[in-house]
Regions:
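Conserved beta-strand-loop-alpha-helix junction that forms the acyl-donor binding cleft
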Residues: 58-67, 91-100, 118-119, 128-130
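A structural microfeature
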Residues: 1-2, 112
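Conserved GNAT acetyl-CoA-binding A-motif
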Residues: 53-55, 82-95
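Conserved acetyl-CoA-binding loop-helix of GNAT-fold acetyltransferases
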Residues: 62, 68-81, 105
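Hydrophobic, well-ordered beta-alpha structural blocks that scaffold small-molecule cofactor pockets
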Residues: 39-47, 78, 82, 105
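Conserved active-site alpha-helix within GNAT-family acetyltransferase domains
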Residues: 73, 85-87, 96-113, 119
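Long, positively charged, glycine-interspersed low-complexity recognition regions
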Residues: 53-55, 108-131
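Conserved acyl-donor/pantetheine-binding loop and adjacent beta-alpha core of acyl/acetyltransferases
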Residues: 3-61, 67, 117-118
Length: 131
């Protein structure tokens, strides 16, 4: 599954933000300190997000059984083509270091490495410059 935000679509609509908040409330019930940590990550994402128009790969998820089959490429190819046609950059965030080489294959480079929670995983922002 890919969730792509077109230019001008960020920040996300209120309905999407409420769905994210619902996930944070569930985290708080299960682990109260998790809410504060989640809030720090969300604030870091908001602060780091570029303000100029670009294509935003908000989410890319492939079932482990379907990984390494080209599905992830196909899921994001339409966005990459649209960005190229528009002459705009693409942007994403990841917390998984193993994703960095994957996204580099598509022309993304690490823009920033953030540590919203000192004891938590880093958050990398990546950008693919207009092609």
């Amino acid at each position: 599954m890919a969730a792509v935000v077109p230019p001008g679509g960020y920040p996300l609509p209120v309905a999407n933000q409420l769905r994210q908040a619902a996930g944070a409330v569930r985290a708080m019930v299960l682990r109260p300190q998790g809410l504060a940590q989640a809030q720090r990550y969300l604030m870091a994402i908001e602060h780091a997000h570029p303000r100029e128009p670009l294509w935003y790969l908000f989410l890319l998820v492939v079932d482990p059984l379907a990984q390494r089959t080209g599905l992830g490429t196909r899921l994001q190819q339409e966005m990459l083509n649209a960005a190229d046609n528009d002459g705009l950059d693409c942007y994403l965030e990841t917390q998984k270091p193993e994703n960095i080489p994957y996204y580099r294959r598509f022309g993304y480079e690490v823009d920033q490495e953030l540590r919203p929670v000192p004891s938590g995983p880093p958050l990398w922002t990546m950008r693919r410059l207009q092609q």
